[in-house]
Design a protein with these regions (language model features):
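N-terminal targeting signals for export/organelle localization
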Residues: 1-47, 175
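Conserved Rossmann-like nucleotide-binding pocket used by diverse enzymes
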Residues: 42, 72, 97
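Hydrophobic beta-strand anchors of alpha/beta hydrolase catalytic cores
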Residues: 68-69, 96, 142
Length: 175
């Protein structure tokens, strides 16, 4: 009896580890349908983050052309990885506006100098109010907005090269 009790913690540990490995190996559904999709943007006006770059408002995003709105930050490591993909989208004719979250102008300027600037406008969301109103919880995160200011798609996390076709398709459907 005591021998069985001695091995019980080891057996329990093996069972827990096996369960953990199984859970980590099981693919999860990475597509999250936003509760904001199909809804108009909440009204907002953000100040310009940088001199020479226009400010950003919800009215700018209802000007007739589908756009990609990208929440980013200079301190965000995945945003650095996403930067070349945003440049690729810009080269393909995608209109991209940025919302800098909890950031400083000098840090954003340095980030864009190092990683490229795909943005037509950059608004400063210093208190994350617009980010929260859109149901976003982190950076990077992007939204496809149709020409009437309605949210058509929410992409959580960095846009990767494999996501470009999906983003282009979402923008085309937003026309």
């Amino acid at each position: 009896m005591s021998r069985a009790l001695r091995f019980a913690p080891l057996v329990l540990l093996v069972i827990l580890l096996a369960g953990l490995i199984w859970r980590l190996a099981t693919p999860t559904d990475t597509v999250v349908t936003s509760k904001m999709e199909g809804k108009p943007l909440p009204a907002f006006v953000l100040p310009a983050m940088l001199p020479g770059k226009p400010a950003l408002s919800s009215q700018d995003l209802a000007a007739g052309e589908p756009r990609l709105v990208n929440f980013f930050a200079s301190w965000c490591v995945p945003c650095i990885a996403e930067a070349p993909v945003l440049q690729q989208l810009k080269q393909r004719g995608v209109a991209i506006d940025g919302i800098a979250v909890r950031d400083r102008p000098e840090d954003v300027a340095a980030f864009l100098a190092r990683n490229g600037d795909p943005y037509q406008r950059i608004g400063s969301d210093a208190q994350s109010r617009v980010q929260i109103a859109l149901g976003s919880s982190g950076v990077p995160e992007s939204f496809v907005i149709d020409g009437r200011g309605v949210i058509r798609y929410q992409h959580i996390g960095a846009i990767k090269p494999a996501d470009v076709a999906l983003i282009m398709r979402q923008l085309e459907q937003a026309r």
